């Protein structure tokens, strides 16, 4: 997910995206805790995507 793609979305769409990413992060963390997650790099990717979305939401709220 690119930041330029996220900037084109509205705040409502970004909030929906954030909610989906938080759910995905929860599921990945549960899989990791139970030893079912083979691709542990996904945790890092989702965490960074959450940060991207939150950053853009904050910048749009300030503008």
Curated annotation (Swiss-Prot):
GO molecular function, one term: structural constituent of ribosome
Cysteine pairings via disulfide bonds: none
Keywords: Ribonucleoprotein, Ribosomal protein
Ubl conjugation among keywords: no
InterPro entries (UniProt xref): Ribosomal_protein_uL29 (IPR050063), Ribosomal_uL29 (IPR001854), Ribosomal_uL29_CS (IPR018254), Ribosomal_uL29_sf (IPR036049)
Coiled coil start-end: none
Gene3D superfamilies: 1.10.287.310
Annotated GO CC locations: cytosolic large ribosomal subunit
Protein name as it appears in the record: Large ribosomal subunit protein uL29
Top-level taxonomic group: Bacteria
GO terms for biological process, alphabetical: translation
Family: Belongs to the universal ribosomal protein uL29 family.
A Pfam family that the UniProt record links to this protein: Ribosomal_L29
Record keyword Signal present: no
